[in-house]
Amino acid sequence: MASKPSIPKGTRDFSPAEVSKRQYIIQTIKANFEKFGFQPIETPSFENSDTLMGKYGEEGDRLIFKILNSGNFFYNKSKIELPESIEELQLNSAEKITLEQRIELNKFTGKISEKALRYDLTVPFARYVVQHQSEIEFPFKRYQIQPVWRADNPQKGRFREFFQCDADVVGSKSLWQEVELVQLYDTVFTSLGLEGVTIKINNRKILSGIAEVIGASDKLIDFTVALDKLDKIGEDGVKKEMIEKGISEDALVKVQPLFNFSGTFADKIAQLSDLLSSSEEGMKGVEELKFICDNVADLGLSTAVLDLDVTLARGLNYYTGAIFEVAAPKTVAMGSIGGGGRYDDLTGIFGLKNMSGVGISFGLDRIYLVLEELQLFPETVAATSKAIFLNFGDKEALYASKAIQKLRQENIKVELYPDNVKVGKQFQYADKRLIPFAVLVGDQEINSNSYALKNLVTGEQVSVDFEGLKKTLLG
């Protein structure tokens, strides 16, 4: 007996009902992207490896899915010296291999894989901007809704294949872009009925300033990567990792105020100003934060809350200014449902210097889980038809099909049961599909140019003409 088929760990199949709910979220996000003036683009699902590698830090690079070279690459083994075993590759214990072995491993990896699945949409977007710069009008506001892949450890709300919904602006250093992106977050989540989200904000310059004043400027990346894990491993875990990365005990004493910041936004700004008074870079970050938050406060938000979180680091190498992360309402145990930030020279890695950008992303899969848990999907979001015409034979099916054709022209979702089988089986099918209405057609209906319309929820059945049928199904 053949084994039961399955899907790879960290991936999912979606039922018609699930797809309808996902499309509801996507269409809501897309409509608001366009309302704010963003234009759509798409990029390939895989990129050249050198486009992606080295852009996400050491931890991010480890999570990139590599694609083996295709075709008859391995048939001609004389061209490549294959390792004899997995142990020889040392893939799962890279820290144990020597520099020489690492160099050989990198050479081998380069021979068997030159492409990789995209890790996010931001780096491919930077590549797109550089490649198509002569065709683009700057500032360029783009949105992109496509899947990405990460070789992560699957858990609740974390998958190896998932969609990102990104909006970015490149070609402008204006902080009004950040103000608008905060408003965009608020508008989208309000449209989805998800009230009480917290938009956390920080600034990479503030983190650089903190590293400077505690004497750990040379450990900035290690410092931010560890700090970004505060919600996962707690204060003690963060301090332990910092020490392991070579950050001194004295530096940890100086950084202690970070873990105790509290009060209003103004209070936090005052505490930051005291801590960073000797850092020009840090104070610049404070001023940028103040500009964004003051203007957002003047404009107002509908349902979201903007909060200054000085421990927010987002362990990605390319952020240079504002950093965003969106937390679900406190009633739901879920990680971030969005994030982003300012990147002043991301396109510089591809040769286009001084092209500042800022962008945000919506986590479709986690937003889905939150809406499902809070029962916020509208009842109108359904993959099913509004009505099914029962089949009593070819003559009746033809009469029904003429009505179906006209109803579909009115954008009403209807269908004909394909087979002339027992009526009980047809009703059972409609019930399992959660179709709310059934239309019955016999000689009496054909002769009187009418339709028997049955409400499958209440059991009520009435005779209607076509206009009455259309009005009910449109309601």
Swiss-Prot record:
What is the recorded name of this protein?
Histidine--tRNA ligase
Q: Which Gene3D superfamilies match?
A: Anticodon-binding domain, Bira Bifunctional Protein, Domain 2
Q: Tell me the enzyme class.
A: ligase
Q: Which residues form the signal peptide?
A: none
Q: Does the keyword Cell cycle apply?
A: no
Major location, coarse class? cytoplasm
Keyword annotations from UniProtKB, A to Z: Aminoacyl-tRNA synthetase, ATP-binding, Cytoplasm, Ligase, Nucleotide-binding, Protein biosynthesis
Q: How does it assemble?
A: Homodimer.
Organism source for this protein?
Flavobacterium johnsoniae (strain ATCC 17061 / DSM 2064 / JCM 8514 / BCRC 14874 / CCUG 350202 / NBRC 14942 / NCIMB 11054 / UW101)
Q: Which InterPro entries match?
A: aa-tRNA-synth_II, aa-tRNA-synth_II/BPL/LPL, Anticodon-bd, Anticodon-bd_dom_sf, His-tRNA-ligase, HisRS-like_core, HisRS/HisZ, HisRS_anticodon
Q: Would the keyword Nucleotide-binding be found if you checked this record's keyword annotation?
A: yes
- Superkingdom in the source lineage: Bacteria
Cell compartments where the protein resides: Cytoplasm
**Which Gene Ontology BP terms does the record give?**
histidyl-tRNA aminoacylation
Membership in a protein family? Belongs to the class-II aminoacyl-tRNA synthetase family.
Q: What is its EC number?
A: 6.1.1.21
PANTHER family named in the record: HISTIDINE--TRNA LIGASE, HISTIDYL-TRNA SYNTHETASE
What sections of the sequence does the record tag as coiled-coil?
Answer: none
Show the HAMAP family listed in the entry: His_tRNA_synth
The record lists the catalysed reaction(s) as:
tRNA(His) + L-histidine + ATP = L-histidyl-tRNA(His) + AMP + diphosphate + H(+)
Q: Name one GO molecular function term.
A: ATP binding
Which cellular component terms (GO) are annotated to the entry?
cytoplasm
